[in-house]
Amino acid sequence: MPIIRRTSRATASSSKSATSSILRQAILVFTGFLLGALFMVFVPSLYNAAEPSSLHRLMNPIRRNTLSARASSDILKLGNPGPVSDLLERSGYILSYNRRDRLAHWVGEHLTSASLQAGQGVDRDKSNFQEDTDIPEMFRAHLKDYVSSGYDRGHQAPAADDLSSQEAMDETFLLSNMAPQVGVGFNRHYWAYLEGFMRDLTQNFTDVYVYTGPLFLPSAASTGRKNPAYSIEYPFLGATTPNVPVPTHFFKIALTTTASSEYALGAFVLPNQAIDSSTPLTNFKVELEAIEKAAGLVFFDKLDRSKFADLCSKTTCQVR
């Protein structure tokens, strides 16, 4: 399958072969601990989650969606090329769709003990993977993209989260809710355990808001100079042409509430690779700002995040 390589160099480049060799080694030894350290490189010191006003400015820049008469009547009079972010509402989740990558930017869910109750006759075996016809065909992920690719069609909003009706279950099998994931050791194991952990949170918390999405993260490679080079490499799926990129990582964020409106936050980033089931979930715990910086998103901007407790101080963060 096609491979995409993207490199951003802070200094003069080293040889391509050396960089590729180092990159492959880095990917093999990449762990949650190193991931957290890498993320901190991308979090600017001026970004302070304790200042809601700064978050408001990030989410609502001064000129956002504001066009002058000249722009509308002159430069864009023949049309606005985009980008377009399709916001799709389903029975059990909402997603923002990335037309370039044929993946979701994010998928959002609101889990409660009541929402996880199974409706009569709901059966996963009745559901089938489907292309999402709400997405224009040229920007759509196709069933044939995944055939013999070596990757699973990994749910972002899990099927087990949407048991209220067969329709809700079926909607989780739309390809807009999928991303290429390593099967054995990840999608079928550790990632599934993480999904179960999110559902289990409803036993101790009134509401659980979950956001999930893909990430494409670079690795640092030594150049022998003061500043490193950052490189990224990932394959594309596609029956005839490259169509769906394979994320290097995935994030999952949980914001829980109690009856007294106390918030607790947990943010995790996992590499898209087999993970030993004994690996502590806390190895993949990161600061929320790290995900925001990497994904270009801002979460929970209507809340004072300085009041969020650490989820792992309120419950045991572990998968099983």
From Swiss-Prot:
GO MF annotation, one: RNA endonuclease activity
Catalytic activity, EC: 3.1.30.-
A biological-process GO annotation: apoptotic DNA fragmentation
Annotated PANTHER family: ENDONUCLEASE G, MITOCHONDRIAL, ENDONUCLEASE RELATED
Keyword Chaperone: no
Protein name: Nuclease
Obligatory cofactor(s): Mg(2+); Mn(2+)
Pfam families: Endonuclease_NS
Domain of life: Eukaryota
Keyword entries, A-Z: Disulfide bond, Endonuclease, Glycoprotein, Hydrolase, Magnesium, Manganese, Metal-binding, Nuclease, Secreted, Signal
